[in-house]
Regions:
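Extracytoplasmic "Venus flytrap"
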Residues: 23-25, 32-54, 76-83, 105-106, ...
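N-terminal export signals
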Residues: 1-18
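Immediate post-signal peptide segment of exported/extracytoplasmic ligand-binding proteins
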Residues: 13, 17-33, 65-70, 169-176
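Beta-alpha junction/loop-to-helix N-cap segments that form part of ligand/metal-binding clefts
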Residues: 20-22, 44-49, 64-139, 153, ...
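Signal peptide-proximal N-terminal region
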Residues: 24, 50-73, 200-206
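Short, charged, surface-exposed loops that flank catalytic or proteolytic processing sites
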Residues: 67, 340-357
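Extracellular/periplasmic periplasmic-binding protein-like sensory domains
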Residues: 131, 252-329, 341-346, 388, ...
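Extracytoplasmic ligand/sensor domains, especially the bilobed periplasmic-binding protein
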Residues: 51, 98-211, 262-288
Length: 428
């Protein structure tokens, strides 16, 4: 891994060795890791994310910790709704005195919890939630950052839905109709909004023939599947996730849906592994970045991390890492790299404000490639899109290696201070 601890004496910043301005505490670092550990989102999202937090903390501790301080990881369940998460975040920061709160898969959780960073004075890093509204202002241009102590260490849903639109334009330039089935809350509404705006800009001839909004946690999609089949769109966009995506896929298989209609899944990368060999081929799948266990990053450092990460995760948990795993890695290593960067200037253990300053404009290596957190406190990433394809080597479809597209970060991330929708509408 190469995560090297930095000694106190090496942090003097011009001072004599051993004369650190700020002593490094000897007690462990208390880091909260909040993911869905129960419920429909646990198996495909929360548990893989939590497993990765545990794996990374274990590796960091074996390598000496962060500036010599071992991590005491506090895994917490995101289940229970928004009010429960607000209460939990307050407790973690104000009572448990965590050094950092890393977490949150649900966009609703993030929208409620991240404002608590500045209110409580605690560092909160959102690791997986996708709504673009989390860090954007109400109109362009807007001031950044929205939160002084709040960050997101992964890109927002803009990359997924813009990436899908770019992919569809390349591979299906003659389609005429699309439809959507998305969960009826911020994540689903925002995902469809960005996809629809991008499609109108890139392929203005395409018409929307059906939009459906099942509730989060729905267990019966037969009516939705029938309605989509009746509308006969060329492609159906979906941001269904977790157990909802698995349930929809299995019910759609039983109704012959995929024999007639192609799906374009925003952040659909985990589901072939979850469903198994029955997962349909030729479906369009986005990876929430370049978070895919067979992706080989072009730079040597990231490529080495990817090989280690995939092998280590598979050895520990018997599965291949999916994108929530990569997002968890990014959160804990964003914190580690920010602390080490801040310590060089602080001359010892940095304050929360100093860590936040160091995390702003931070670039650090990851298994998917270098990650940059911009001055708006949001990470930007490239995005990978491909087609599902069965092969003899794996018991589930992989992405067809001959038809994968990586769209670079500048093509799928709006500039700092510009709302994503406004940016798309400005395309020439």
């Amino acid at each position: 891994m190469g995560a090297t601890a930095v000694s106190v004496g090496a942090l003097g910043g011009g001072k004599a060795i051993g004369q650190a301005k700020k002593p490094i505490p000897k007690d462990p670092l208390k880091i909260a890791a909040v993911s869905f550990l129960t419920g429909a989102a646990a198996a495909p999202f929360g548990i893989p994310g939590d497993n990765t937090f545990k794996m990374c903390a274990d590796v960091i501790n074996k390598e000496g910790g962060i500036l010599g301080r071992k991590i005491e990881l506090m895994s917490k369940d995101e289940a229970g709704g928004v009010d429960a998460q607000v209460k939990l975040a307050r407790k973690l920061i104000l009572e448990d005195k965590v050094d950092a709160d890393l977490g949150y898969i649900s966009s609703a959780s993030c929208l409620a919890v991240l404002p608590l960073s500045d209110e409580t004075g605690g560092l909160i890093v959102a690791y997986d939630c996708g709504t673009h509204e989390l860090m954007e202002g109400t109109k362009s241009p807007y001031e950044v950052p929205k939160f002084k102590l709040g960050f997101r260490s992964s890109a927002h849903l803009g990359i997924d839905n813009i990436g899908l639109a770019l992919f569809i334009k390349k591979y299906y330039p003659k389609i005429k109709t699309i439809a959507g089935v998305n969960p009826d809350y911020a994540w689903g509404r925002d995902s469809w909004l960005i996809f629809e705006v991008a499609m109108k800009k890139l392929m203005p001839q395409v018409q929307v023939v059906k939009t459906l909004w099942p509730p989060l946690g729905n267990t019966d999609y037969t009516a939705h599947i029938s309605a989509l089949m009746g509308a006969e769109p060329d492609i159906v966009h979906s941001s269904l996730w977790g157990g909802d995506a698995v349930t929809f896929t299995k019910q759609a298989l039983g109704m012959g849906f995929f024999k007639k209609i192609k799906m374009a899944y925003s952040r659909g990368e985990p589901y072939p592994q979850e469903v198994g060999k029955d997962y349909p081929e030729e479906q369009i799948i986005c990876c929430a970045g370049t978070h895919y266990f067979l992706f080989n990053p072009p730079d040597k450092t990231s490529s080495g991390l990817q090989k280690w990460f995939v092998a280590e995760y598979h050895k520990r948990y018997g599965k291949y890492p999916t994108y929530p795993c990569y997002h968890a890695y990014q959160a804990i290593y964003a914190y580690k790299n920010a602390v080490e960067k801040a310590a060089k200037t602080a001359g010892g253990w940095p304050t929360i404000d100093e860590i936040a300053k160091a995390m702003t404009r931070l670039t650090f290596p990851s298994p998917s490639g270098p990650i940059t957190i911009r001055e708006d406190h949001n990470a930007i990433e490239d995005v990978l899109v491909g087609f599902s394809k069965l092969t003899p080597k794996y018991p589930f479809p992989i992405l067809d290696p001959k038809r994968m597209e990586v769209f670079p970060a500048p093509r799928v991330n709006a500039p700092v201070g510009t709302r994503t929708v406004d940016w798309i509408n400005s395309w020439k």
